[in-house]
Curated annotation (Swiss-Prot):
HAMAP family: HscA
UniProt name for this protein: Chaperone protein HscA homolog
Keywords: ATP-binding, Chaperone, Nucleotide-binding
UniProt-listed PANTHER family: HEAT SHOCK PROTEIN 70KDA
Stated family: Belongs to the heat shock protein 70 family.
Gene Ontology biological-process entries: iron-sulfur cluster assembly
Gene name tied to this protein: hscA
Keyword Membrane appears in the UniProt entry: no
Organism (species): Ralstonia nicotianae (strain ATCC BAA-1114 / GMI1000)
Role played: Chaperone involved in the maturation of iron-sulfur cluster-containing proteins. Has a low intrinsic ATPase activity which is markedly stimulated by HscB.
């Protein structure tokens, strides 16, 4: 999700007053920090000149932690206390973690986000990520020679509210002021679009260590519009490592394996994968803790066979994103590759074959996201320079709505809406004297609440008692620049108000997102039939409720025969409401409504006479 930049906060009036802000690519495998210096964005290296920081944290028995290369070296020897690829766990519950059986960790199935047992105690993914972010913050401050005013941190476009909030929490824990969360493909678009002065429709194919994103972007005269997004936040280079590791286990007959040996084989698998990016074959040699030895030859051809379905798994969201954008493959003017995993020849061949053109690779795929984030951070800090006259528009991937009577969904913000965005809609009460309203916030493309994802519930109380339909409750949905949702409800007469910030306890898996979209497309006709049925039932129940109150108050206005006729129509409607034919229900509602027109007119006459009783004509003037 999410960035709409219209105007910038106070700009620095002079170069010597420039405020220091950085862009951080918090990656699954590696993380980077970059800054704009002398109008040039650059990745900030460590003391040894290394731009990448392995996203690895090892907790020590005596307290403290090793971060980066030092931790990576110890990963095989101390796998349970060395956390790698923590990004996969951000905002996730235990059931959402992919390949959990192949991880060496002791998980704690805590409410909400998964936690990990270490020698230093139970750690959350937020705490682990904060260690990485704090290291990058210190690197930046040491390099730039001053404190930072803030950072733009990149996240996968398909990160949901829980994952985004977890990222912001980690940044705050690391002492960073978050200027903005920025989609990784969007960050790449900033870097490529500005560097190359490109215009037209582009695709950004971003395959990192643990996440995959695809974005379709329209670049026109400095305006970056994200037309659609897609992806899988549990698919990345790590999955290719897993395939190789499983192949090694199968070829060498190595079951069962200790956590230490599994980590060793994953490291060997990663090394083999990287070697095959520039060679036709590689040797895999390992000595396990049991003394067993492994010697295998992995060819590029075998690797392609092992990972073919993973490659295809990235192409399905690409096709879906193109459909959502209303763009044909031949309209794409260029494909930008982002993420170290895109160095794999199997990926580059598949992308070239799908789009019918070689992808763009003139920027380092490991660094392009951090560079784009640094450029955005510099602008948000107020460091505008000549030529920084560009606009960025981004979108949300799934519709946001509210449940109405009958279990229906009223969409407030449709999917692919540009954000930040605020939309409001008025609703009313269903019953006479209703003083409270339950607000059920939903996400998804289906017509009925039961088929959508529940995000939050809250109540608006203190509504003044009125007849049904008289109260006006204004419900406002607001998605901020980081893609986080807040919902408020306000009764317009009394001013009573309630609100909630939506923070799901754990994230929505991307298989679920894809399934929700697919079901929405496939079930559209049936959903509309069910919606029509629910709407007619609600209308029927509303009419019966109103008529019941009217008969209690003014039933004496009807003769015995008239009352019998109305009762017969009421009974007929009640029977019809139990059926599944929405047209029959509508006919029964219309019949009862027309059958009580005369009764309604008599009630109105009685009400007018009561209101005028005892008043003089001049008082009415």
């Amino acid at each position: 999700m999410a960035l709409l930049q219209i105007s910038e906060p106070g700009e620095s009036p002079a170069p010597h007053q420039r405020r220091l802000a950085v862009g951080i690519d918090l990656g699954t495998t590696n993380s980077l920090v970059a800054a704009v210096r002398s109008s040039v964005p650059e990745v900030l290296p460590d003391e040894q000149g290394r731009p990448l920081l392995p996203s690895v944290v090892r907790y020590l028995p005596a307290g403290g932690a090793q971060i980066g290369y030092k931790a990576q070296v110890e990963a095989v020897r101390d796998p349970k206390n060395t956390i790698v690829s923590v990004k996969r766990f951000m905002g996730r519950g235990l059931k959402d973690v992919a390949h959990i059986e192949n991880t060496p960790y002791d998980f704690v199935d805590a409410p909400g986000m998964v936690q990990l047992k270490t020698v230093a105690g139970v750690k959350s993914p937020v705490e682990v990520s904060a260690e990485i972010l704090a290291t990058l913050r210190q690197r930046a401050e040491d390099t730039l020679g001053d404190d930072l005013v803030g950072a733009v941190i990149t996240v996968p476009a398909y990160f949901d509210d829980a994952q985004r909030q977890a990222t912001k929490d980690a940044a705050r824990l690391a002492g960073l002021n978050v200027l903005r969360l920025l989609n990784e493909p969007t960050a790449a678009a900033i870097a490529y679009g500005l560097d190359n002065a490109a215009e037209g429709v582009y695709a950004v194919y971003d395959l990192g260590g643990g996440t995959f994103d695809i974005s379709v972007l329209k670049l026109t005269k400095g305006v970056f519009e994200v037309m659609s997004t897609g992806g899988d936040s549990a698919l990345g280079g790590d999955d290719f490592d897993q395939r190789i590791a499983c192949w090694i286990v199968e070829q060498a007959g190595l079951q069962p394996l200790s956590a230490e040996d599994m980590r060793l084989l994953l490291n060997k698998a990663r090394a083999a994968k990287e070697w095959l990016s520039g060679a036709d074959s590689t040797e895999v040699d390992a000595v396990l803790s049991t003394g067993e030895t492994v010697h295998l030859v992995l060819t590029a051809e075998t690797f392609a066979e092992l990972t073919a379905n993973l490659v295809q798994k990235t192409l399905a969201p690409v096709r879906r994103a193109l459909r959502d954008a209303g763009v044909a493959v031949d309209e794409i003017q260029g494909v930008v590759l982002v993420g170290g995993a895109t160095r794999m020849p199997v990926i580059r061949r598949a992308v070239a074959q799908l789009f019918g053109r070689a992808p763009l690779t003139n920027l380092d795929p490991d660094q392009v996201v951090a560079i784009g984030a640094a450029m955005q951070a510099s602008l948000l800090a107020g460091n505008r320079a000549a030529g920084d006259d560009w606009l960025l528009l981004d979108v949300i991937p799934l519709s946001l709505g509210v449940e109405t009577m009958g279990g229906l969904v009223e969409k407030i913000i449709p999917r692919n809406s540009t954000i930040p965005v605020a939309r409001a809609q008025e609703f009313t009460t269903f019953k006479d004297g209703q003083t409270a309203m339950a607000i059920h916030v939903l996400q998804g493309e289906r017509e009925l609440a039961g088929d959508c994802r529940s995000l939050a519930r809250f109540e608006l109380r203190g509504i003044p008692p009125m007849v049904a339909g008289a109260a006006r409750i204004r419900v406002t949905y607001q998605v901020d620049a980081d893609g986080l949702l807040s919902v408020s409800a306000r009764e317009t007469v009394s001013g009573v108000e309630a609100s909630i910030a939506v923070k799901p306890s754990y994230g929505l898996g991307d298989d679920d997102i894809a399934r929700m979209l697919q079901e929405g497309f496939q079930s559209a006709e049936e959903d509309m039939r069910r919606r029509a049925l629910a709407e007619e039932r609600v209308e029927g129940e509303r009419l019966l409720e109103a008529l019941s109150h009217a008969l209690d108050a003014d039933g004496d206005l009807l003769s015995a025969d008239e009352r019998a006729a109305v009762d017969a129509q009421v009974a007929a409607l009640r029977v019809t409401l139990q059926g599944e034919d929405h047209r029959a229900i509508k006919d029964a509602v219309d019949a009862l409504s027309h059958g009580t027109d005369e009764f309604a007119a008599r009630r109105m006459d009685r009400g007018i006479r009561a209101a005028l009783a005892g008043k003089r004509i001049e008082e009415l003037g």
